[in-house]
């Protein structure tokens, strides 16, 4: 855990009060949601509330982290995004592709763990570094629509230099302004305020943005016309928020299975303790291990291995040796663990039996998605819809920034409601197996509509050099055959 994560709770306590005063707003994020986000984050970091080494011997296997990783992997499988139509579209495509290629799975995993994160253009013209990823404790919601869409938000940025704390509050919201004719117009406003403090528990005094070199190029107030959506995208889980029905924020994928995750850790810990305590021990009467010396004293004559113990009491002359063979309840433990895993699968939106403890290998595994796993497929598809919605909103925000930075206007197909999502987004079919994909690709290759090179690389495992060598050899054989060589002269 880094420094800022350690002081996060302290910062948020004063951040709410001070930021509300600075911008004359009220946050609509409830304490219940903030506390839940903290709890979910602790769980996926391996510190769930039910683990206390001082009071119990429960250890966590952090199944919640695995659940988020597995789900993000399935949801983002082979994800690609194509934004086309103009020079501007090409720039936007580079920004989105950089995110998809390097970060999207990790960010979806974060979203699944804490309920939602914000994707926000930062004003950079570098496509590889244009998008910021904001966790829930680094923003506060000020306004929402009746549909639950976020309309206003304050973001907090932090710097620590020479033991001095610097904070920048960035407030995004819609307001109104009158044009020359006196008509009211909607305006998107971004306000930036900087603060300097010697303490981590207050914003301190207000300073100018240019007092901090990293923020010197940022305008204090920016007004943008003709904006219909916020210039950020909220990537949230597609689950109903029953913790706070009025909140626009999402909930963790495992929020409804906390007790089952606790039960799983208990069951796994008991299984581990049982294995640890299962060592075969042989008890031998100590009289049989010693000899009587002068004066009637008895001295030890044998150095015992770790699996042999001497015992003064409990053994008589007729039973010099006693065997202790601990009972292993492995089968019962595994049955119990699989029962818990089945309930976790159900309560997290997966088909029963999606996660099992393999009796042969002793490993926790996820079963292959089959055609009858309707719950799993529906959950993954719902998550994919959330991803597409967030990416479309992010594309919209980047397009507005293109206007601000003078990038030539042009058609962007991803912003055209008449363009189907299938033309913009591609996800791997959950129900298609590798063999099915290879068979389909092979048939298309035979028909001449699928690249031979692509087929050999994706489905036969050859690299470009090997494919080049194969094509060259094939071309040489064809040339020799046409010229009468390659046994043709015989």
Q: Where do the language-model regions lie?
A:
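Long, highly charged low-complexity segments enriched in Glu/Asp and Lys/Arg with interspersed Ser/Thr
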Residues: 458-488
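Extended, helix-rich architectural segments
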Residues: 1-160, 487-490
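Short amphipathic alpha-helical segments
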Residues: 87, 96-104, 256, 260, ...
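Short coil/turn segments at secondary-structure boundaries
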Residues: 83, 107-108, 121-123, 275-284, ...
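A glycine-biased, small/acidic residue-tolerant capping/turn segment at secondary-structure junctions
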Residues: 393-422, 467-470
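Extended, charged amphipathic alpha-helical segments
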Residues: 4, 212-371, 375, 407-408, ...
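Extended, non-catalytic structural segments that build the interaction scaffolds
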Residues: 28-29, 34-38, 42-60, 312-347, ...
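Extended, regular secondary-structure scaffolds
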Residues: 118-249
